[in-house]
A protein has these predicted regions:
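Short hydrophobic/Thr-rich beta-strand motif most characteristic of the beta2 strand and flanking loop
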Residues: 31-40, 46, 66-67
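Short amphipathic alpha-helix used as the core "switch/output" element in two-component signaling
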Residues: 60, 64-83
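Two-component/phosphorelay signaling modules centered on CheY-like receiver
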Residues: 17-35
């Protein structure tokens, strides 16, 4: 069932094509855009081409490897290339130490395979809201910097009356009155 309130751009990176298909079917009802990659090798170029809010990143890509180091490596690459993107790590070989390493390295959350659909959706939507909030904070900080750099930008108008008023305010502001 399609939802009217779908928001956010999600990128899923996993080497298992069956998982990618299942996740795309599940999450397309909840996110505006769901893109999949079956290898992290194109991750950085994909992020340069399109702005994603959240990346769901598998932690193991090579056959026989299950220690999570590949995911941690790609997490670091992603944090450096696109610090605004929130990352949720995703693995079948989870333990507390690996989850802690991932969170310390900058992941927003950690999900274990096999996943519970409701929990996965809730996690990804929560992380999307975090991403949106952080972008809004950054936008507001930039506006604040602009106002601080150019105090005149706080005033509307360039008429003679407004210029006179600005001069009066600046004169009074320098006094103890």
């Amino acid at each position: 069932m399609a939802r009217k309130d779908k928001q956010g751009k999600l990128l899923i990176v996993d080497d298992n094509k069956s998982i990618l298909i299942a996740l795309k079917l599940l999450l397309s009802s909840y996110f505006e855009t769901v893109t999949t990659l079956n290898s992290p090798n194109n991750l950085l170029s994909t992020l340069r081409e399109e702005n994603f809010d959240v990346v769901l990143l598998d932690m193991n890509f090579s056959a026989g490897v299950n220690n999570g180091n590949e995911g941690l490596y790609w997490l670091e690459q992603l944090r450096n290339a696109a610090p605004y993107v929130q990352v949720v790590l995703f693995t079948a070989y989870a333990d507390i130490d690996l989850a802690v390493k991932g969170i310390k390295a900058g992941a927003a959350d950690f999900v274990v395979k096999p996943w519970d659909n409701a929990k996965l959706i809730a996690t990804l939507q929560s992380v999307y809201r975090l991403s949106r909030s952080r972008r809004e904070v950054k936008r507001l900080q930039e506006i604040k910097r602009e106002f601080q750099a150019e105090p005149r930008a706080m005033y509307w108008g360039e008429s003679r009356a407004m210029n006179d008023l600005r001069q009066l305010i600046e004169k009074v502001a320098r006094t103890d009155a």
